[in-house]
């Protein structure tokens, strides 16, 4: 199975064209028009190396998040930030709240960190029971939380993050928070862990999902601990962020029209998508805070449903390789209304079939 989902390129090489890719959680509005215009008029920037310190880029990211230049580290996608942070901090024992992004484990494996997992439970609608979590928390060096969570779409409000961090600080445990999807959360500006301004917290972000530019590869980290930043920079390769990625960060963060349109779309569409999916037989869906939905299959298994959906020109995410999930789960992106209708219709037809798994 592919680690991150549908591998649309492999399917296309096999002759499957015109697929709706619902395995990838990218903003359906596509690349912002203002960024496209800037790219067309900016080919001259390729004639020079990027600023090795990325001062203007970091200033823009800092202003967007209400922090200072010295709080920002940039990288070639959030993945570079993740691997840099683990390499710099070298936690001997790490607790991951799961299910979660597979790259956490890969990054920790490179430094031979002992990995423990704490499960989000279906009976809690995948929401973290904070008091129980703190009660059962083992001694470790680092806790990793994906917030909003991928693949469940659950979200831990800021006051609960503050409660968790306060307890972790007392125990000498650092907190790593992946906020790659937070801009899809309603009122996210008042829910981000940045507001805590805690030296104990490292926050990872990316432009990939919200601004629909996975091919650009621009991620960043936010820390209020200057020593963490220095350690990460010492391991960082020069010019890992290319000139167009730098341009993206300096352009898209200020595209208020695109941001407002996206926020309006996700507020309406996630509600509609959840309500419509509830009408489909033999599945269970969970309320989401973001642009994807976790689906439990009450009939058939994930690999079977994935193949049948491909026959209907739709790629879904087989979620069975997430920690604590199994072949009863798939994940669906939320896209534009026209395509969402097609996908839910296809899923309804698949779940009605009488074939045996």
Where are these regions (language model features)?
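Active-site phosphate-binding strand-loop segment of PLP-dependent enzymes
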Residues: 123-183
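PLP-dependent aminotransferase-like
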Residues: 87-145
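Conserved PLP-binding catalytic core of the aspartate aminotransferase-like
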Residues: 267, 280-312, 334
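PLP-dependent enzyme catalytic core of the Aspartate aminotransferase-like
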Residues: 159, 311-312, 323-357
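Short acidic capping loops at alpha-helix termini that bridge into adjacent secondary structure
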Residues: 68-72, 172, 179, 199-200
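PLP-dependent aminotransferase class I/II
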Residues: 30-32, 53, 200-279, 283-286
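Short loop-beta-helix segment that forms the pyridoxal 5′-phosphate
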Residues: 50, 62-84
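N-terminal "arm"/small-domain region of PLP-dependent enzymes with the aminotransferase-like
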Residues: 1-48, 139
């Amino acid at each position: 199975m592919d680690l991150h989902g549908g591998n649309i390129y492999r399917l296309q090489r096999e002759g499957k064209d015109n697929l709706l890719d619902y395995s990838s959680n990218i903003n359906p509005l596509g690349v912002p028009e203002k960024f496209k215009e800037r790219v067309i008029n900016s080919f001259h920037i390729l004639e020079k190396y990027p600023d090795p310190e990325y001062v203007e880029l970091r200033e823009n990211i800092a202003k967007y998040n209400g922090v200072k230049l010295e709080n920002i580290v940039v990288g070639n996608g959030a993945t570079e930030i993740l691997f840099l942070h683990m390499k710099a901090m070298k936690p001997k024992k790490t607790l991951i709240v799961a299910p979660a992004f597979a790259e956490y484990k890969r990054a920790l494996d490179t430094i031979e960190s002992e990995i423990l997992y704490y499960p989000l439970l279906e009976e809690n609608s995948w929401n973290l029971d904070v008091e129980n979590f703190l009660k059962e928390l083992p001694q470790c060096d680092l806790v990793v939380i994906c917030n909003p969570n991928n693949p469940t779409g659950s979200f831990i409000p800021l006051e609960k993050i503050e409660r968790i961090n306060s307890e972790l600080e007392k125990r000498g445990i650092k907190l790593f928070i992946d906020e790659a999807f937070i801009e899809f959360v309603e009122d996210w500006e008042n829910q981000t862990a940045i507001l805590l301004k805690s030296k104990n917290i490292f926050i990872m972000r990316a432009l990939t999902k919200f601004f629909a530019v996975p091919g650009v590869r621009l991620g960043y980290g936010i820390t209020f601990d200057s020593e963490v930043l220095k350690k990460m920079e010492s391991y960082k390769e020069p010019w890992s962020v290319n000139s167009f990625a730098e341009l993206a960060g300096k352009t898209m963060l200020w595209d208020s029209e695109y941001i407002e349109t996206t926020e309006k779309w996700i507020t309406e569409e996630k509600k509609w998508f959840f309500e419509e999916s509830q009408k489909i037989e033999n599945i269970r869906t969970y309320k989401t805070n973001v642009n994807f939905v976790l689906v439990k299959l009450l009939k058939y298994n994930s690999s079977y449903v994935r193949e049948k959906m491909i026959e209907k020109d739709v790629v879904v995410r087989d979620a069975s390789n997430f920690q604590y999930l199994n072949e009863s789960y798939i994940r669906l992106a939320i896209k534009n209304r026209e395509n969402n209708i097609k996908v839910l219709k296809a899923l309804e037809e698949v779940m009605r079939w009488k074939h045996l798994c």
